[in-house]
From Swiss-Prot:
Annotated Gene Ontology cellular component terms: extracellular region
Keywords: Antibiotic, Antimicrobial, Bacteriocin, Plasmid, Secreted
The organism of origin for this protein: Haloarchaeon S8a
Cited InterPro entries: TAT_signal (IPR006311)
Keyword Transport: no
Record's miscellaneous remark: Halocin-S8 is quite robust, as it can be desalted, boiled, subjected to organic solvents, and stored at 4 degrees Celsius for extended periods without losing activity.
Protein name stated in the entry: Halocin-S8
Record's function text: Has antibacterial activity against the haloarchaeons H.salinarium NRC817, Halobacterium GRB and H.gibbonsii.
Keyword Nucleus among record annotations: no
Positions of the propeptide removed during maturation: 1-230, 267-311
Location(s), subcellular: Secreted
One Gene Ontology biological process: killing of cells of another organism
Amino acid sequence: MSDKDSINRRNVLRKIGGIGVASAVGFSGLASGESLSDDEKQDVIDTIYKSQRVEQIKKKFGGVNIEPKKVQSVTTNQSGDLVTAKLSVSDGDLVYSSVKDTTVIVQFDRSASEIGESWPKNTEAFIKSTSSGVDLLRTATDEEIKDVTEGVNTSEIESADAVNIFIDPESQTYYMEKYDFNNKVLEMFELATGGTSSGKISPTREDQNHEYNVREHKVFNSEKQNIQLQSDCNINSNTAADVILCFNQVGSCALCSPTLVGGPVPTVACLLVVCFGTPNAVSAILEEVDNSCFNLIKDVISCWDEWTSFW
């Protein structure tokens, strides 16, 4: 990031510097949008909207209104460069992360059908823009969830503490994620339909690989990462949401500790968003963070080297 893109105003650094957030990877602090001046907020907006990821969204989905309305939260590194941000936009929320590879996610606050797609009712749509391109994804219906989970080894689903499914309707790719709290294991399956004439999933328990064409299977065991967490404030359920949101592909094994985020449900929501950019889980996390908890993480990412090499 060039100097002109740095969020390096003294007031920003004074307000959020020295907090000690994830110093192993250079994070210097986090601030709520309310604590920034108008000029500082504009600096954040300018940096995000000059990014290639936002341009990709505008080019492919010109009808989506991502005009910025409010800066909700910001993190910077020690040089003042923008690391993560969450903004309210006209059509929902926009999440920006430049930790490893810059990622922009737009989570709509309305149903998918309202943006011109003939998708089932009660599904939610979101855009994910990365170096690999731009995808418009949606959450699964109850019937699709049933079909997918029945097509996967029954014991795997029954043993999971939580399962999440979302879909790329254009490529008919289904993604399933499940988390085992006891063994601290997160698994992600990238699946495809079995080539049925209707395009509808028709899984069988006997031959899930044939029906699903499992393209990729990732397993992440957080217990093996030797994570150490410390907190200086009392954390109520879900209050660490904006601290962990958007730390895409970095240290999620530590940031998503059940102790940190207040229990199994918000922990899974955290893991799905943070690790794999799955913002349909955001609804499980409160929008606001108690300012007193901005100082809650001291030593976070001892797993940094193993995490980056794993992915």
